[in-house]
Design a protein with these regions (language model features):
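A structural signal for repeat-array scaffolds
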Residues: 1-35, 59-67, 144
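Tandem amphipathic alpha-helical repeat scaffolds
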Residues: 3-13, 35-49, 69-86, 107-125, ...
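Short, basic, alpha-helical segments at the C-terminal edge of helix-turn-helix-like DNA-binding modules
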Residues: 488-503
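Intrinsically disordered or compositionally simple regulatory linkers and C-terminal tails
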Residues: 388-433, 438, 506
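Helix-turn-helix DNA-binding segment
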Residues: 419-483, 500-506
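Acidic, Ser/Thr-rich low-complexity linear motifs
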Residues: 144-149, 324-334, 365-382
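Amphipathic alpha-helical segments of tetratricopeptide repeats
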Residues: 24-28, 58-62, 94-102, 133-144, ...
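Single-residue signature of alpha-solenoid repeat helices
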Residues: 23, 53, 90, 128, ...
Length: 506
């Protein structure tokens, strides 16, 4: 009886990814009770087997008679609905679970959190913030301990994202700091990496790209071992931050290696490279998405329309997008659309956009920001220059202008760097998963380049190309050999072949 009670408590309690990885091997053994099946399905959710977890929990929900256990199943289904894009079902499940979940502060907080996440996916940030605050209130009644810290770090993470979307950049930074503190208490490497990524996301949204690059770089290394979508998205965010700083070649390479990103993301990358016609093709070929997707695509379409010779239509599209996003609480994106619309108004009528620049910079600064959505350096330079005339905005305007000019200078010197596709791009995910560092990947990429040029592979020449000593190169190659497990095969060419073979791993 005591064992069953413990199993029931585990099935109901909040779980971390480390808990799930520890419990899963045990849960496949022995008699499969309802409690064990629920716990196993929940563990599968945390290791991102979303479809399997959804199928099992959906099957179990009508069979569970224990009210708290049924509420737990429903809460996890609400969270899964976000990952599987089943927002309508989340509404139905939430209504069914509310009464039972209300008797447990953890369940109620997680139910509200799940509701908030699904509203975020629908671009309803005002409602999502309200749900997140209600979750915070519910968690106030929960007993202190690891379970409370675990739910709190996820809640603060959600708040950090929402407050960034709402352009409350100072509050978002505070929430990101809280996420880091609570994650440290939990002691789960997954939550710690999530918290580091969150700090990067908040910094990027606020326009602090140097800080964002630092956070994303630190988050990427531990996340690469999990082989999950979060690692890919972190790479995408790192690519975006670097490209906005003018590091076009490296950013473009990272974006390809991430193998993720929506059409609007890749359209933005094309705009950063100065390829408006490519952005237009990307968006034209994209299938019609959910309404929430189209809001952001219309934003980029407006910029592209203006870049491609129809600024009047572009301005109208951008102003429509700004109103729509603002009505949903997405103030960060509404402000960004306003900046781009003002820039193109200035191109149409001298002074028409500049008259709005100071107010836009004032609004960004009052919220704790230093940039804008779908950042383009040339737009930033114009915005800073136009707003410098106003004493109250001069300091921030000069910062915005200086960063834009630095990005343009960097991009002009970076434009000659090769950004062609590499066969290693397709293998990057697997190579990072087996432990190769970015430095080691760079060595493999140089090996590939030497081979493509038809040159003889010579370690001294390779070391000179890489800017390292032959001894340092030897150490790196030895480590690559061990990680790729090439055995006794001789020659450095076998390292490249083994690395490229990783691209065919399912």
């Amino acid at each position: 009886m005591a064992i069953a009670s413990t199993l029931r408590e585990q099935a109901i309690a909040p779980l971390s990814r480390a808990d799930a990885e520890r419990l899963l091997p045990q849960l496949s053994l022995g008699r499969q009770t309802i409690e064990k099946r629920v716990l196993r399905a929940r563990c599968l959710k945390y290791v991102e087997s979303f479809d399997v977890s959804w199928a099992e929990l959906t099957q179990l929900l009508p069979q569970v008679k224990d009210r708290l256990l049924a509420a737990r199943v429903a809460v996890d289904l609400v969270h899964l609905a976000y990952y599987l894009v089943r927002g309508e079902e989340a509404e139905r499940i939430t209504k069914a679970a509310q009464d039972h979940a209300a008797s447990d502060p953890f369940l109620l907080a997680e139910l509200r959190l799940g509701r908030s996440i699904n509203l975020t996916a629908a671009n309803e940030v005002t409602g999502a913030l309200q749900e997140a605050r209600w979750a915070e209130d519910a968690l106030g009644a929960a007993p202190k301990g690891r379970a409370r810290d675990l739910v709190m770090t996820r809640l603060q993470r959600q708040l950090a994202h929402l407050l960034s979307h709402a352009a409350d950049y100072d509050a978002a930074r505070a929430a990101a700091d809280a996420t880091t503190r609570f994650a440290a208490r939990v002691g789960d490497p997954w939550e710690t990496a999530w918290a580091t990524y969150t700090g990067g996301f908040v910094a990027w949204m606020a326009g602090r790209n140097d800080e964002a690059v630092d956070h994303f770089t630190r988050a990427e290394a531990p996340l690469s071992t999990y082989r999950t979508s979060l690692w890919r998205y972190t790479l995408l965010c790192l690519a975006r931050s670097r490209m906005e700083r003018g590091e076009l070649a490296e950013g473009d390479r990272l974006a390809r290696q991430s193998a993720t990103g929506a059409p609007e993301d890749h359209g933005h990358f094309a705009l950063l490279r100065g390829e408006a016609e490519v952005a237009e093709l990307i968006l034209a070929r994209a299938p019609r998405g959910f309404p929430a997707d189209e809001h952001f695509r219309d934003f980029v379409r407006g910029i592209v329309r203006a870049e491609r010779g129809d600024p009047r239509k572009g301005v109208r599209m951008l102003e429509d997008v700004a109103r729509e996003l603002g009505s949903r609480g997405l103030e960060h994106w509404a402000l960004g659309a306003g900046v781009h619309a003002a820039y193109w108004r200035e191109q149409l009528v001298r002074g028409a956009g500049a008259s709005r620049a100071a107010q836009l910079v004032r609004d960004i600064g009052a919220r704790g920001g230093e940039g804008f959505a779908y950042y383009l350096p040339d737009v930033a330079v114009w915005l800073g220059r136009a707003a410098e005339r106003e004493p109250s905005t001069r300091r921030l305007a000069r910062t915005i202008r200086a960063r834009g000019e630095a990005a343009l200078r960097r991009a002009s010197t970076d434009s000659e760097a090769p950004v062609g596709a590499s066969e290693l791009d397709g293998a990057t995910f697997h190579l990072r998963a087996v432990g190769l560092t970015w430095r080691e990947l760079g060595i493999l990429r140089e090996l590939e380049r030497v081979r493509s040029e038809g040159q003889r592979l010579d370690r001294d020449a390779l070391a000179a190309r890489l800017g390292v000593s032959p001894n340092t190169l030897r150490v790196h190659l030895t480590r690559i050999r061990a990680k790729l497990d090439v055995g006794e095969k001789r020659g450095d060419e076998v390292l490249l072949e083994a690395a490229l073979a990783q691209g065919s791993v399912a």
